[in-house]
Amino acid sequence: MVARFSGASDVVRVVALLQFGSAVPLGIFAATVYARQLRLGIRVPGPAIGLFGGILASVMLMASSLVIWVLSRPEVTVDAVLTHALAFLAFVTGGVGYVVGMGLLVAGIAVPALILGLMPRWLAWTGLVIAALSELAYLSMVIEPLVVLLPVGRFGGGIWLIAAGFLLPVSRAAANRRNGA
């Protein structure tokens, strides 16, 4: 573990920088979708749950990247136990913490979209499955084989958010046109 971080400290530092940078647009996306849902007249808890999840995912990703940055410091990686502990902290914040937040963000968009017909039903249902698997990923903290759910939430959730961002109507009039009203 020490060799991985101390042998490539410049690369680790760049990874931390890029990961931190990716957390900012996620938070902006969550706020933008929240505002769009309110503009669409959605007055149920879903938008607030999604906003909370998006902020949580963004903050967890930032925290993970800051810990990774600390791991790029040669004065830290001289201590093998500390390096190992910080690597676990980076993993749990950037893995479980991020994916649980991502699942809430996806659910906060998918549930109202399904109920109100704001996107194709298959896409909304796919979002619900991704959200459920993302929430179950927290069990990987005690049932280690469930870490396989982390990439489902991370990559599946990211792909789903891109699709939802394009398909979620920008106004009530657009939603009505889509639904034939």
Describe these PLM feature segments.
Residues 1-181:
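Hydrophobic, aromatic-enriched alpha-helical segments typical of multi-pass transmembrane helices
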